[in-house]
């Protein structure tokens, strides 16, 4: 959920729900990470903060010890980590443009009259995803409008945008010449991958499932 520049109320709401759903719960220790790391840590007197890259790697390694590559796509940015010999060997970040991130999809969903969850679900029913390339939001907007004029369905536009997100990550941020360069054991993270159409587009591009 967007925090509108102030994550404190959202964190408070989440904690209250946690206690409500688990009466008697006692939290032994709390670590914060991400953009609001210090702010949230100080506001809620958390035990410590952890650099975001270390948090991503630690979580990925916990669930997949032999992880080769981590892709994190959030609302505003994208981070990718190459793992070699059990350590991060390279980090790839997207440029200032938020094209290919969660806010990118949300912008188009709202412009077309949907919330992002509905818009993502429609993409799973595409029969001919629109080829929108992997350009920035401004140019992509004109491509979407042209696709609408050409009679493309919302399903095919949604799927096309999801494919653009994936291709932007693989071929512009990581600059891979082929999906195989990422390795065999890949972990995806970040809220954008809750978009089932993006996850499916990634699986298809990687040649799995």
Annotate each predicted stretch with a short phrase.
Residues 2-4, 19-53, 82, 89-90:
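Short beta-strand-loop/turn "lid" adjacent to the catalytic site in phosphate-handling enzymes
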Residues 35-36, 164, 177-205:
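Glycine-rich phosphate-binding loops at beta-strand->alpha-helix junctions
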